[in-house]
């Protein structure tokens, strides 16, 4: 079980070929982060394998995997897209699209046979690439006058958030990103600085 502020995904494309009773299943695991990317990749594979009987798929998006969909593309309901999505879930992955292309071999596989074949093809494609862990991060924006710069940067150095954006002038601004589980401590330290600076520091939570 993953920690609440960690998710697993892939960064490379994986491929696999699964054969069952002369039907060939070509499976592709693709890293994606947006619905537009998903649509583009589906279109690419539909055009590339225009002569295939079925181009089925499933995807899961978002750091918490809260956006997902599966498609049977003409196969009996629940025999293709759902087993593919099930493999994405079983490996606790998100931000991934799996496409399985089927070339019919002349022998019907039946409902259970299709489920097994699509599940196996998807699993092999997902297992063909490394699974990596990423953290779910939160951001804060700090606004302050220049005399506070050293104090602000000292906390940055000690807590090690990632500095996303910075402006150092008479009026300064920094935008910091940090793993969610560590963000409260960072905010707490800056809230103490708000008090000691007599409200010269403003904190905006994003």
Language-model segments: residues:
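Terminal, non-globular segments
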Residues: 176-185
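Short amphipathic alpha-helices in soluble, non-transmembrane regions
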Residues: 152-158, 184-194
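Glycine- and acidic-rich phosphate- and metal-coordinating loops
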Residues: 94-104
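Short amphipathic alpha-helix segments
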Residues: 143-161
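Conserved short beta-strand edge segments in small beta-sheet-based binding/regulatory domains
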Residues: 163-168, 192-206
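Short glycine-/aliphatic-rich beta-strand segments at the starts of folded cytosolic domains
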Residues: 130-146, 174-176
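Conserved mixed alpha/beta catalytic, RNA-binding, or beta-rich assembly cores of soluble enzyme
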Residues: 77-90, 101, 114-118
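C-terminal regulatory domains involved in ligand/effector binding and gene-expression control
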Residues: 1-78, 201-206
